A protein has these predicted regions:
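ATP/NTP phosphate-donor binding region
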Residues: 2-255, 262, 266, 273
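Non-catalytic interaction/regulatory modules that flank or connect domains
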Residues: 128-132, 531-539, 545-558, 566, ...
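Conserved beta-strand elements of beta-rich interaction domains across eukaryotes
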Residues: 57-60, 66-67, 81, 134-136, ...
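Eukaryotic beta-rich interaction modules
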Residues: 30-46, 53-65, 73-77, 175-181, ...
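Generic C-terminus detector
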Residues: 157, 162, 166, 170, ...
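Catalytic core of DAGKc-family lipid kinases
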Residues: 207-209, 231-233, 239, 246-247, ...
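Core residues of folded domains in eukaryotic genome-function proteins
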Residues: 48-50, 55-57, 70-78, 123-127, ...
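Catalytic phosphate-donor-binding core of small-molecule kinases
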Residues: 321, 371-382, 516, 547-549, ...
Length: 646
């Protein structure tokens, strides 16, 4: 029998943690708070013992082997969830004896406790802990998926072992949620599901497959339930959010490009109860479009790796359950009012954005190809641009904000997980993701079969059984991720219930609500305090996020809620070489001249108006084409809420 946890949980007991100094803790630093501790073993290594401690910092693993000791820690911020499972009953004709030797290639199969397929001869309870650990490299970093398996088998009855496992599960779930009052059974504060809306046409048309293969497994690990809807037509998401009882859900997650986020956002502002809706509901985004500016901005501001696995980065953001306030810009044309979160454009970038739609099938590369085309046949536009400069106090607040989400150091962070030499046989890759649009994707495009996703550390409490060779092979695993698309944690797939025609809940006339404008009428002259530039322009583009797309670092000083619009003006007369340098610099934020330039300038403003003289051209709001003509916009700081990693 192994040592029992130093801190126990009674049936109605709240853990009263005791402070304890972990190895490597500086005497001047506050001690770690230890909630649970237990001794585990690796059955294949007779002399290896792990003391596992759950602290306020994370899951501490102290390895003792042949007289040497090594301590590693998985930070709480990297853990997304855990589940208690038990072994699956063996197929008829196979050995049912729990102490039968398992070959090196055998894989343990686990099921839910009440699935009806459990192996009654195995009294062990298995706790699977899922973490995505930050790894740094010269290119920035990535998150490595690590699964820790704790096998509880100290007692003769499954119920007793499961009670111990559930105690650990509850404590981990509470701490990951940021709560320190821990009870033996986990009861989440929020029981409502997420509303997930997928635009299957976004980007290269693979959003549905990407959600199935890369997002649903992460939601399953975090035990996040959701209702899933597939859009049927343009503005479907907008109509759905406007008409439905959205308070049935605790948040909205859109899967697609920036366009579907724009739809959902404006659907909220078309509700009579818009103020309550934006106060209570947070919106998140999984980037499957061509641009993905907001998702990239969030990852950039919170120092999260994005380029290698953007969908994973955003899925982890969703499961963290955190949010930030988000500036929203009210935009007005001659016939329409809308609310924007990303940008307003006139000229070169808008031309590229709209005219490259014919190349949508090639994904984000369409922007590069059309940029070259537009640079060769450059257009200019006559008109007038007016703006309200941002106050100095706003500028100081913006530039003095610390860079959010810097990853702090720590003693003994888990550098490498201990893994059995087993490989994932990814069903999604073998079958081409179900024969859909992603059928020809290579293994390099599938998160499931990435080698960084196969790390497993398996530990067990003591007994006379040394036969455990763990390998998860259930609907939680990569080999059966197709089922998670429909069944993850009581989630519901709803798309076939919606009508193929009309609005999701019957037609009604849309009216835009939201905060009223504080600007002069669009037909009236601008007020005192506005500055005006009259002339010929190559482009005018206003942005309030750092990135307009994954590789367009447009406004490096921007924050999610700084109350500033960054207005870029490029006047006619700029040389093609200067424009080429500008376009090339957009990828790393070096596009703005470091010295005064008469043709290119970036101005921080709180409102602006564009008045074209001609009648032909493109104007865009959040990448969507809008009526060409006079347009004005003003920022409303911190009006909405968006999901963020921390």
């Amino acid at each position: 029998m192994v040592d029992k946890p130093k801190i126990g949980l009674g049936s109605e007991e709240i853990v009263n943690p005791s402070p304890a100094l972990s190895k490597g803790t500086d005497c001047g630093s506050p001690p770690h708070v230890v909630y649970l501790t237990e001794t585990f073993y690796i059955s294949s290594k007779k002399n290896t013992v792990f003391e596992v401690r759950l602290t306020d910092k994370g899951l501490s693993l102290k390895k003792q082997s042949n007289g040497s000791t090594k301590e590693q820690t998985i930070p709480l911020k990297d853990i997304i969830g855990c589940r208690c499972l038990r072994s699956k009953r063996k197929a008829k004709g196979s050995s049912a004896c729990a102490c039968t030797s398992i070959s090196g290639t055998a894989q343990l199969k686990v099921v839910e406790e009440n699935s009806g397929e459990q192996d009654e001869s195995d009294v062990s309870a298995y706790l699977y802990i899922y973490a995505y650990i930050m790894k740094r490299n010269r290119r920035g970093g990535f998150r490595e998926r690590t699964t820790i398996t704790l096998r509880f088998r100290s007692f003769d009855k499954y119920e007793d072992n499961n009670k111990e496992a559930q105690k650990w599960r509850a404590a981990i779930k509470y701490l990951v949620a940021g709560e320190t009052s821990i009870r033996p059974t986990y009861q989440p504060k929020e029981t409502r599901k997420l509303l997930v809306i997928i635009n299957p046409k976004s980007g290269s048309g693979k959003a549905r497959e990407m959600f199935q293969q890369r997002v649903a497994p992460v939601l399953a690990e975090a035990e996040i339930s959701y209702d899933l809807h597939i859009t049927k037509k343009s503005d479907w998401a907008r109509e759905f959010v406007r008409n439905r009882d959205i308070y049935l859900w605790r948040g909205i997650v859109v899967v697609g490009g920036d366009g579907i986020f724009y739809e959902a956002l404006n659907g909220l502002f078309e509700r009579e109860d818009w103020q309550t809706a934006i106060d209570e509901l947070t919106i998140g985004i999984i980037p499957c479009g061509s641009g993905n500016g907001l998702a990239k901005t969030i990852a950039h501001l919170y120092d999260e790796p994005f380029e290698t696995k953007p969908i994973l980065a955003s899925a982890l953001t969703i499961v963290k359950g955190k949010h930030s306030l988000l500036d929203i810009v009210r935009v007005e044309t001659r016939s329409k009012i809308m609310f924007s979160f990303l940008s307003v454009g006139w000229g070169l970038i808008s031309d590229i954005d709209i005219e490259s739609e014919r190349l949508r099938a090639i994904g984000g590369q369409r922007f590069t190809l059309w940029s070259v085309h537009r640079l060769i046949s450059l257009r200019t536009y006559q008109g007038k641009v007016s703006y309200v400069p941002a106050l100095v106090s706003n500028m100081n607040r913006s530039n003095s904000l610390p860079h959010e989400g810097g990853v702090g150091g720590g003693v003994g962070l888990l550098k490498h997980s201990i893994s059995y030499n087993t490989t994932l046989d990814c069903h999604d890759c073998r079958t081409g993701g179900g024969g859909g649009a992603g059928a020809n994707d290579s293994h390099s495009n599938c998160d499931a079969c990435d080698t960084n996703f196969s790390d497993v550390l398996s530990l067990e409490t003591g007994s006379n059984l040394d036969t455990f060779r763990p390998r998860i092979d259930s609907w939680y695993s990569a080999t059966s991720r197709k089922s998670t698309y429909f069944s993850t944690v009581d989630s519901i797939y709803e798309s076939d219930r919606a009508s193929n025609e009309g609005t999701p809940n019957g037609a009604n006339v849309a009216q835009m609500y939201g905060p009223p404008s504080r600007l002069p009428a669009l037909t009236a002259p601008v007020s005192d305090g506005w500055k005006t530039i009259d002339g010929e322009f190559v482009m005018v583009h206003a942005a309030y996020q750092t990135h307009l797309s994954t590789d367009c670092f447009f406004a490096p000083l921007s924050k999610l809620n700084d109350g500033i619009i960054w207005l870029l003006i490029i006047k006619a007369g700029v040389s093609r070489s200067q424009l080429l340098s500008f376009l090339l610099g957009l990828s790393n934020g070096s596009h703005i001249p470091t010295q005064a330039n008469r043709y290119i300038q970036m101005i921080p403003v709180t409102a602006f108006r564009i008045e074209p003289s001609g009648s032909s051209g493109h104007m865009t709001v959040d990448g969507e084409n809008v009526e060409y003509g006079p347009i004005q916009a003003e920022i409303f700081p911190s009006l909405a809420k968006v999901m963020v990693p921390k």
